[in-house]
Every structure is written in C-alpha cells, then in structure tokens.
Amino acid sequence: MTRLRRLLVTDRIFFVTSNLLHGHSPLWDREFDLLIDVFKAVRQQLGFALCGYVFMPDHWHALIWPQFPLTISRVLKEIKEVSTDLLNQQRRVEGNIWQPRFWDRFVRNKKEFNERLEYMHLNPVRKGWVVRPQDWRWSSHNNFSLDPLIVGACPIQVDYIHLSDDYRG
C-alpha cells in the first residue's frame, strides 16, 4: 500500500497536525516555550501567516497560510527539523521526535476556519489539562481577547486575516 501523496499547493490556509513519534516522552513547559521560539523563528525566516495554534503534550495543531511559492510541506519540514534539533539538545538524545508525516486539510471558508480554531483552543479543555481555554498558555486563544493587555502578553502574536464567507484561497 502506498502512502498518500501530498499536493504541492500554496496560497491556502491549512489546518495541520503534527504528532510525536510513539514512545517519546510528552512535551511540557520548557519544551512548549522552545516550540514557541521555533515557530517565531521559522515564521520570520519563511514568511508564512500563522493564524492560530495549540501545543499539546503529544502533538500540535496550527492554522498556517504559506504565501506563494512557499508550500505547507516546506513550512512543516523546517519547523520539525529545527524543533527536533533543539529538543534533542535539551533532552540529550538523538533521532527523530516527530512522526515523519503530518496531517493537513485546506480551510475552505470562514465557518470552517472558525471551527478549526475553536477545536484547537478547546483541545486542552477536552483533555482535562485546564478548565477554560484561556488558561492554557500554549495556544493562540488569548490572541482573540478584546483586552489589549491580554493580547499583548501572548507568546506568539498571530496574523489576523479577513476571510469572506466563501473563501477558497
């Protein structure tokens, strides 16, 4: 059985998921902070829009919009390579940390964008890590607060975009 082929598509918003390899110990505070630094650095380097994210102990989700000619595969490759190197240094281990592939889906409209964003932000609540999504430090939830002091304290500032009701990229 062959693995799924990935289309080389750009100029779309993608909902992506990347999982730790089976058997790796979960990520926690210091490692989440490291992932935040990686996302900021890779976004600065490659120039993609980050519209939302959540880091969980065994996986992460993000809404990423790579600008032409950048592809989602290139973005994920860079995030995973840089984070693997830094996490391995911190853990004093070698080898892959992330599963080699990732899951992605085009976001087709504003409704779907908001559903994916809500899914990400409620993930820590569903898993029982916090009672309210705003209490999970490692997500973009607080970027969408109406209080500018809360937004200013967010570890990653997300890119705010305007989508029409019938966005198709």
Language-model features: where?
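Short catalytic/metal-binding and nucleic-acid-binding patches
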Residues: M1-G169
